[in-house]
UniProtKB/Swiss-Prot annotation:
The gene is mshA. GO terms for molecular function: acetylglucosaminyltransferase activity; D-inositol-3-phosphate glycosyltransferase activity; magnesium ion binding. This is D-inositol 3-phosphate glycosyltransferase. It comes from Jonesia denitrificans (strain ATCC 14870 / DSM 20603 / BCRC 15368 / CIP 55.134 / JCM 11481 / NBRC 15587 / NCTC 10816 / Prevot 55134). Keywords: Glycosyltransferase, Magnesium, Metal-binding, Transferase. Homodimer. PANTHER family: SULFOQUINOVOSYL TRANSFERASE SQD2 (PTHR45947:SF3). The keyword Transferase applies.
């Protein structure tokens, strides 16, 4: 392989969830946003991106043009619907076959890089990269060993097959991309990744889509438009309804606040999202709300599109993220871009996404008592709230997709040069 030009065409693989899917339900989340926004930003810098994902409905077109230079290709691999993520490894041969068939219709050397997202995609990615004689760049997004070390009560551990699959992808990848220094350290210590091939590239945020309110009048007007009272404290949770994201912690903390301060006005907790993995998860969370006696203070909202999500974030006093783990936590950066501070668990990438006591607060554990105490301080200290609100937008402005794309393209280039040297 000889390198005479920057990577101008990238094959991105995203097997288990489409970048076009609505975040906040099923398996769709921050990774979906990451893939499509990174692709758009790289295309704006002159690199074409084709994203391969598994077809999940019969009426999905073969190809969708997302933006200039960005295509999503739907690959048939197994049943369209009703296939659990845990069953997807059995469909990887069909998915890989579909990816290779697309490239076979092109002139040789069509793609310069394969970039896979999540371990399932890495399994298909290393075969495609080997066939096309191009480097494989891989982003884990989440890792089984990390998740298993921080399981929520009653949550099932990730299977041994996934751990083995991740080890294989780490070994086969020419470059590994981590969201944070902490994730890079986990790749090295938990998966024996060569530090020389691990690169840290921070995700971004669309600062034009996620903006602060112009003034208090706009904030109050948006609250009314969303069915809220113009005054009063509002806490927003936005994410999939699953133990990993910890919405149960917020419900229990709210119940403690109510019992400890029965005469104080209660905040409204808005839970935005749908179930993931277990369809019963949403019903169980609703039942928990009633059992804890806080139903009148909790509002459930379906997964929201980007403009509506930005509205919810603008009207909130705080966005809360009691996740058991996050490789980064895009919701945190989106909220802060709206000028809303974040109260987050002190885990994973959230320690980078949130600047403690500057743009938000990091909570040391997942005990409802601890969260109730932090919420009590955060809601009761007006000076702290205003200070964090001022710092939130400043912190978010450090993260842009344009910067992410620039750094990622640099990783591609270094990886291609190294591969060229190694193969002579």
């Amino acid at each position: 392989m000889t390198v005479s030009h920057p990577a101008h065409r990238v094959a991105m693989l995203c097997v288990h969830t489409s970048p076009l899917a609505q975040p906040g339900t099923g398996d769709a989340g921050g990774m979906n946003v990451y893939v499509v926004e990174l692709a758009r930003a790289m295309a704006a810098q002159g690199t074409e991106v084709e994203i391969f994902t598994r077809r999940t409905t019969a009426n999905q077109p073969d190809v969708v043009e997302v933006d200039d230079g960005v295509l999503v290709r739907h690959v048939t691999a197994g049943p369209y619907e009703g296939l659990d993520k845990n069953d997807l490894p059995g469909q990887l041969c069909y998915f890989t076959q579909g990816v290779l068939r697309t490239e076979a219709a092109r002139q040789p050397g069509w793609y310069d890089i394969v970039h896979s997202h999540y371990w399932l995609s890495g399994q298909a990615g290393w075969l495609a990269a080997d066939r096309w004689n191009v480097p494989l760049v891989h982003t884990m997004h989440t890792m089984a060993r990390v998740k298993n070390a921080q399981l929520a009560p009653g949550d099932a551990p990730e299977p041994r097959a996934r751990i083995i699959g991740e080890e294989q992808v780490v070994e086969q990848s020419a470059a590994l991309v981590a969201n944070t220094d902490k994730e890079a350290h986990e790749l090295h210590t938990l998966y024996a990744a060569d530090p020389e091939k691990v690169h840290v590239v921070a995700p971004g945020v669309d600062l034009a889509a996620f903006t602060p309110p112009i003034d208090d009048h706009q904030r109050q007007a948006e609250r009314v438009a969303l069915g809220l009272a113009p005054e009063g404290d509002v806490i927003v949770f936005a994410g999939r309804i699953q133990p990993l994201k910890g919405p149960d912690v917020l419900v229990d903390a709210l119940a403690l606040l109510r019992s400890q301060q029965p005469d104080r006005p209660m905040p409204t907790l808005v839970i935005i999202g749908g179930p993931s993995g277990r369809p019963a998860a949403l019903g169980e969370l609703r039942a928990r709300v009633f059992q804890r006696g806080v139903a009148q203070h909790v509002r459930f909202v379906p997964p929201a599109d980007r403009p509506t999500l930005a509205q919810w974030m603008r009207v909130a006093d705080y966005v809360a993220m009691p996740s058991r783990n996050e490789s980064f936590g895009l919701v945190a950066i989106e909220a802060q871009a709206c000028g809303t501070p974040v109260i987050a668990a002190d885990v994973g990438g959230l320690t980078t996404a949130v600047a403690h006591k500057k743009s938000g607060l990091l909570v040391p554990d997942h005990r409802p008592q601890t969260w109730a105490g932090v919420l009590q301080v955060a809601l009761g200290d007006t000076q702290l709230r205003e200070s964090l609100r001022a710092g939130a937008r400043r912190h978010a402005q450090q993260f842009t997709w344009d910067h992410t794309a620039t750094d990622m393209l640099a990783v591609y280039e270094r990886t291609r040069v190294a591969a060229s040297v190694n193969t002579g």
